[in-house]
Amino acid sequence: MFKLDLQPSEKLFIPFITAGDPVPEVSIELAKSLQKAGATALELGVAYSDPLADGPVIQRASKRALDQGMNIVKAIELGGEMKKNGVNIPIILFTYYNPVLQLNKEYFFALLRENHIDGLLVPDLPLEESNSLQEECKSHEVTYISLVAPTSESRLKTIIEQAEGFVYCVSSLGVTGVRNEFNSSVYPFIRTVKNLSTVPVAVGFGISNREQVIKMNEISDGVVVGSALVRKIEELKDRLISAETRNQALQEFEDYAMAFSGLYSLK
């Protein structure tokens, strides 16, 4: 299990990529680039054919990964390869619940352990159904990451009291995707979550530029960035796949990712 111990001036930068997009070996290099860009932890997404929480950018990434033959087992093993190749930040497996259900639970947790996966995030599992999985995570020393969206304060308290690692605070209802602006009601909601939580609070769903990062960092402990990075991978995919242009494309990706991290001001 991991804890994110932040210094007062330090902010979380938690990027999301889809395992196997555009091809598995490039996913490893992308993870290393994100670590160099200042990532605090990495969300590694499992490609799924019916991703209810994801917008078109991540849906297309899932399709590219599925076309490569990716599945939950291969995604976990890819996380292990990342750890073997120098990624030492926590890796959080981001998966819908159905792929987990397809596996024997002991086998699933053994895979997580063997591949040094640090955390688990299941976006489509409501609070009422998550307790047994949370307990299993605890017994296997895997950090279960809780998602919170605007809801009643009593429900918020229940979710946040059980939170480990960090709280993933959903900035917008609906699917993931780049947003130019957020509803004004999101800011008091984030402040409420921050006041209730004893673990760091990271804001995700729609963070797409440096200005939004600065704004969210003022009221939370940092950001989760998914669609903006996955869209950049899509833009660079042909150059990332080609051995001749890969290094240059990886550097371009790292520079782009750094705008979301605490290293931006050091560059």
Curated annotation (Swiss-Prot):
Pathway the protein takes part in: Amino-acid biosynthesis; L-tryptophan biosynthesis; L-tryptophan from chorismate: step 5/5
Cellular component aspect of the GO annotation: cytosol
Subunit structure: Tetramer of two alpha and two beta chains.
GO terms of molecular function: tryptophan synthase activity
Active site: E43, D54
Record's catalysed reaction(s): (1S,2R)-1-C-(indol-3-yl)glycerol 3-phosphate + L-serine = D-glyceraldehyde 3-phosphate + L-tryptophan + H2O
PANTHER family: TRYPTOPHAN SYNTHASE ALPHA CHAIN, CHLOROPLASTIC, TRYPTOPHAN SYNTHASE, ALPHA CHAIN
InterPro entries: Aldolase_TIM, RibuloseP-bd_barrel, Trp_synthase_alpha_AS, Trp_synthase_suA
Gene: trpA
SUPFAM superfamilies associated with the record: Ribulose-phoshate binding barrel
Enzyme superclass (EC): lyase
Keywords: Amino-acid biosynthesis, Aromatic amino acid biosynthesis, Lyase, Tryptophan biosynthesis
This protein's name: Tryptophan synthase alpha chain
Domain of life (superkingdom): Bacteria
